[in-house]
From Swiss-Prot:
UniProt gene name: BZ2
Pfam families: GST_C_2 (PF13410), GST_N_2 (PF13409)
Catalytic activity: RX + glutathione = an S-substituted glutathione + a halide anion + H(+)
Keywords tagged on the record: Transferase
Gene3D superfamilies: 1.20.1050.10, Glutaredoxin (3.40.30.10)
Similarity comment: family membership: Belongs to the GST superfamily. HSP26 family.
Protein's organism: Zea mays (Maize)
Positions of transmembrane segments: none
Keyword Transferase: yes
Enzyme Commission designation: 2.5.1.18
Protein name: Probable glutathione S-transferase BZ2
Domain GST N-terminal residue range list: 1-80
Length: 236
């Protein structure tokens, strides 16, 4: 399989983490992260023109990171490759629904708030974005308490992360870069002790070590995005 994506893209990391956890060999086809879309990307994802895109061996394409992760899980289950301790989604229908719900929350609420911290046009907007990020993390702290059953990961297991772990874990490099750039503490032992422990366990997992980009690389990319955002403000 091949993945159209970017090394520092958190959504690409989410798809790659799922492939890595499932032991699926793939090739990362690097796409430039900018306003100009390649013909290859537009052909693979003509609806949104966004990464990541999972290119199947037969030429078909699957878009959107959360959809890609669930596709990988569905294939593993149908082929008999999903064992009880390595499921990305729980067997229980209610728990599956809850994991999907919180994945949507991360994408719709947490990530836009975190992204706005670094790209906010004014100090006031940045302070509001940081407050929104902390509010989202507070809710995710409670979600971890409810979903993990006292275990290491959101998945409810100690050995392997699941869908919800990948959904939040793919943003850890961006979160740490944001903290470093702006002198913030967003996930820490005082405000979110459960997430603090989880973040350390997730970052130490072999799949995360293989896939997640170095924080400094994300810092440099974020600075590039900040310059772009400032330029757009000046020319608008």
């Amino acid at each position: 399989m091949r993945v159209l994506g970017g090394e520092v893209s958190p959504f690409t990391a989410r798809a790659r983490l799922a492939l890595d956890l499932r032991g699926v060999a793939y090739e990362l086809l690097d796409e430039p992260l900018g306003p100009k879309k390649s013909d290859r990307l537009l052909a693979a994802n003509p609806v949104y023109g966004k990464i990541p895109v999972l290119l199947l061996p037969d030429g078909r394409a699957i878009c959107e990171s959360a959809v890609i992760v669930q596709y990988i899980e569905d294939v593993a289950r149908e082929s008999g490759g999903a064992e009880a301790g390595s499921l990305l989604l729980p067997d229980d229908p209610y728990e599956r629904a809850m994991h999907r719900f919180w994945t949507a929350f991360i994408d719709d609420k947490f990530w836009p708030a975190l992204d706005a911290v670094s790209l906010a046009p004014t100090p006031g907007a940045r302070a509001q974005a940081a407050e929104d990020t902390r509010a989202a993390l507070s809710l995710l702290e409670e979600a971890f308490k409810d979903r993990s059953n006292g275990r290491a990961f959101f998945s409810g297991g100690d050995a392997a992360p699941g869908l919800l772990d990948l959904a939040l874990g793919c943003f850890l490099p961006a979160l740490r870069a944001c903290e470093r750039l702006h002198g913030l503490s967003l996930i820490d032992a005082s405000a979110t002790p459960l997430l603090d422990g989880w973040s350390q366990r997730f970052a130490a997992h072999p799949a995360a070590k293989r896939v997640l980009p170095d924080t400094e690389k994300v810092v440099q990319f974020t600075r590039f995005l900040q310059v772009q955002a400032q330029f757009r403000v000046h020319v608008s």
